[in-house]
């Protein structure tokens, strides 16, 4: 059949500069979750192809490209990095995976981390993650199933490991030393903003 003759290269996006085709992406450039990793997702979600492409505007050339073949529920871009957010599960089993890439010319993948809950926010998901002084700060929400207190909110701080492809948890609120919940009982978060070393909810 026609599908049997289709190769992975046939499915890749095409790019053109001044109406001329450019060979800028190989299937070997595409990254996927390592299913054997302890922090890997357990479901398939809604797989999509997300491309990172470095374009030299002055020279009108494509310097590099990376292909990411997993669900992408949100994107956050800092001055030095770009983060893809991948959410899984629901209720008290919900979690979010955060995948980090450098924004230099090689677009290198540098690591992934996991936090409890989702970065939900009625269209404001990307405001719930922030990079500051080498730390990644994330606000997540999680449904509890309790009608009297239906939501738990968390602030998690991650940091790039110096010797592995991991975004490691540095701290989280609430915790055993600071157990107070982040909001009033049964209260939803409608806005999240990071400014320097302060967080406004």
Residue ranges and their predicted role:
Residues 1-201:
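Beta-sheet-rich non-transmembrane sensory/scaffold domains
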